[in-house]
Curated annotation (Swiss-Prot):
It catalyses: L-homoserine + NADP(+) = L-aspartate 4-semialdehyde + NADPH + H(+); L-homoserine + NAD(+) = L-aspartate 4-semialdehyde + NADH + H(+). Its cofactor is a metal cation. Belongs to the homoserine dehydrogenase family. This is Homoserine dehydrogenase. Transmembrane segments: none annotated. L-homoserine binds at residues 192, 203. Its EC number is 1.1.1.3. The active site is at 207 (proton donor). Catalyzes the conversion of L-aspartate-beta-semialdehyde (L-Asa) to L-homoserine (L-Hse), the third step in the biosynthesis of threonine and methionine from aspartate. NCBIfam families: PRK06349.1. SUPFAM superfamilies: ACT-like (SSF55021), Glyceraldehyde-3-phosphate dehydrogenase-like, C-terminal domain (SSF55347), NAD(P)-binding Rossmann-fold domains (SSF51735).
């Protein structure tokens, strides 16, 4: 019976939205969790920055001495949900080095220091779990590390940031510009006071690094991930997207690439992209997340759900806690880091996609042929072209706008083409360059 087993001591570091929910689940579901683990889970302490009486938990559980809490002999598992890279890194390493398993949701730390943390866990023969670091409540880490362990993953792509997906969904459905949609997201609590990490793609890039590392058995850091944000997306881009039967989503894409010489590389990238309305990811709206995994034998799998928030993230954290505690009781370990492949990261210029290019041009004859010539010079094939008038607030035509959709082209060739277009006298400026994804997602 669970009650006959030695209790598993748990320390929780952080008592914000996620930490509070984790503590609530541990306390309110104690009997069920004990049955699933095979022993009671006992909360030994909660690490906070400041000990105050208004935290909703017994004050005797609170401490601001993180190092002392992690070092306690009666703590077997440390749950880290503090957030910042430091002091989280120090606390996690301290726990692992003392032989304690760790559960963390710290994507920023994992995207830069997974190797160091995994090595510390390996040396101490303990577990390091981080399901909640990517896409909140959506189970995607465990399927990649366990369910698909016998398969070859080819591609992982999806929407992994709820803030940007809410903003883009609002722009799509209401016609709002970026600033208005961001203000709405902030008012509803979907965007941080400083939204840079979300809207510039840093958050999604950290998650892409984690997913690529796991899926392809190599080591990818956030610095290896090509990144673009959503701040330059305009209502006009959505209008053109609709005309093409698409919407716009911020995608994280990780894929295995075979070069012409037959060697294997990994690509990891984050950017806004046009997605066909027929694709399942186009229907992922609001703050929801979704991840599509493609594997050789399993084919295409899709995971969908809430990607952020206290309760959804705590669900994933507590799931990891149960796994780590069960291993502790049984004297076993969970999956170890698998980095045997050591694949190089492909530079962005190597990647082939289709492109949507929008530019403001002079409203006179010969402009379209001049624009098309620059694409042809760099062997970028045009699939579709549209030209429309630009009017001022009074309805007077003041210029023209050309939208070009290409066939597959390398990023390097497209970048050269855009630079050349900007140098043309008849082009007043290239306003948008957005990739088209969908057929390979």
């Amino acid at each position: 019976m669970p009650g006959d087993e030695k209790p598993v001591g748990v320390a929780v570091l952080g008592l914000g939205n996620v930490g509070s929910e984790v503590v609530r689940i541990i306390e309110n579901s104690a009997e069920d969790l004990a049955a699933r683990v095979g022993a009671p889970l006992v909360l030994r302490g909660i690490g906070v920055r400041r000990v105050t009486t208004d935290r909703g938990v017994p004050i005797e559980l609170l401490t601001d001495d993180i190092e002392e809490l992690v070092a306690r002999e009666d703590v077997d598992i440390v749950v880290e949900v503090m957030g910042p890279v430091e002091p989280s890194r120090k606390a996690i390493l301290g726990a692992l080095e003392r032989g304690k398993s760790v559960v963390t949701a710290n994507k920023a730390l994992l995207a830069t220091s997974t190797g160091e943390l995994a090595q510390a866990a390996e040396s101490a023969h303990v577990d390091l779990y981080f399901e909640a670091a990517v896409a909140g409540a959506i189970p995607v880490i465990r399927p990649l590390t366990q369910s698909l362990a016998g398969d070859t993953v080819l591609r992982v792509a999806g929407i992994v940031n709820g803030t940007t997906n809410y903003i883009l969904s609002a722009m799509d459905s209401t016609g709002a510009d970026y600033a208005s949609a961001l203000a709405d997201a902030s008012a509803l609590g979907y965007a941080e006071a400083d939204p840079t990490a979300d809207v510039e793609g840093y958050d999604a890039a950290a998650k892409a690094a984690i997913l690529a590392s796991i899926a392809f058995h190599t080591r990818v850091t956030a610095d290896d991930v090509y990144r673009e944000g959503i701040t330059k997306v305009t209502p006009a881009d959505f209008g053109s997207a609709h005309a093409l039967g698409c919407t716009i989503k911020l995608l994280s894409i990780c894929e295995r690439i075979t070069t012409d010489e037959g060697s294997q590389r990994v690509s990891a990238r984050v950017y806004p992209a046009l997605v066909p309305l027929s694709h399942p990811l186009a229907a992922v709206n609001g703050a929801f997340n979704a991840v599509v995994v493609e594997a050789e034998a399993a084919g295409r799998l899709m995971f969908y759900g809430q990607g952020a928030g206290g309760a959804p993230t705590a669900s994933a954290v507590t799931g990891d806690l149960v796994m780590a505690a069960r291993n502790r009781v049984l004297g076993s370990r969970g999956p170890r880091e698998s980095k045997y492949a050591q694949l190089p990261v492909a530079p962005m210029g190597f990647i082939e996609t289709r492109y949507y290019v929008s530019m403001n041009v002079a409203d006179k004859p010969g402009v379209l042929s001049a624009v098309a010539a620059e694409f042809a010079k760099r062997e970028v094939s045009i699939a579709e072209v549209r030209q429309e008038g630009v009017v001022d607030e009074g309805g007077r035509r003041v210029g023209a706008r050309i939208v070009v959709v290409t066939h597959l082209a390398t990023d390097a060739a497209l970048s050269e083409t855009v630079d050349a277009l900007d140098d043309l006298d008849v082009v007043q400026g290239v306003s948008s360059v957005i990739r088209l994804e969908g057929t390979g997602l």
